[in-house]
Amino acid sequence: MKRFFLALLIFSLGNSLVEASDPAEDALRERMIKAGLLPGYLQAASIPSGIDLLPPPPAEGSAAAARDREGNERILASADSSRQQQAKIDAATVFPGVTHSFACALGIEIGDATTPALYRLLRRSLADFGLSTRPVKQKYMRPRPFLVNGKPPCTPNEIETLRNDGSYPSGHSAYGFGWGLILASVAPDRTDAVMRRGIDFGDSRQVCNVHWPSDVEQGRVLAAAVFARLQAEAEFRSDVETARKEVAAARASGASTPANCPR
């Protein structure tokens, strides 16, 4: 996760940083490009400040912290095997796979071959939503649930990375909710389904035992702020309109429902 955000930061700062980067950063950039990441729409200075917008995470010993503990215990106890499996799937942020469950909510395939404009819109906006959480994470470095409750996360291979990456707020929640907002703009009649998927995407991080409830809630707040700020970008508005027409045309032509969707 830390490397993921570093790659987003490199992209957001543009080629001037890349030209001055060391070989390790160049290699990281190449891997992230292969994963399908693209530079966002917003310059780093234009991304809403989570430090100004969000309250600090709940203080240890506070009633809010107790609610987070209770919420964490409740969701871990209630998640069945199918929900746990979906949470593992949602943990991966590699394109094109990360868009599949959102395609199920939208009702048509999302991909470079089927809906290239929408696919690019999601790839670019992920950087804006994801980067918005980074300064807050770095400021507070809130310990993740698995470090507190002693229960393993759903992705044990990421323990060492997540151990050194702040829990508050959730980046997954930010871009999951943000994608829900974008997809609702692209296909308004699918608003309920795509927003539910965006919410569930963030909730998967609670099922994975890597985020507290308040991490996920505040990730959504930050996503809403980023989405509002994106409306001021002509390129973003144009891309949303292009994606809207593309999706409408695909649906009118009888585009098939994605395969292997959760039931």
Please report, for each region that a protein language model flagged, where it lies by residue:
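Hydrophobic alpha-helical bundle signature of multipass membrane enzymes
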Residues: 21-207, 232, 239
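Non-catalytic nucleic-acid-binding interfaces of large nucleic-acid enzymes and RNP effectors
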Residues: 17-19
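Acidic, carboxylate-rich catalytic segments that either coordinate divalent cations
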Residues: 24, 231-263
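Interfacial helix-loop-helix junctions of multi-pass membrane proteins
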Residues: 200-231
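Bacterial N-terminal signal peptides
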Residues: 6-15
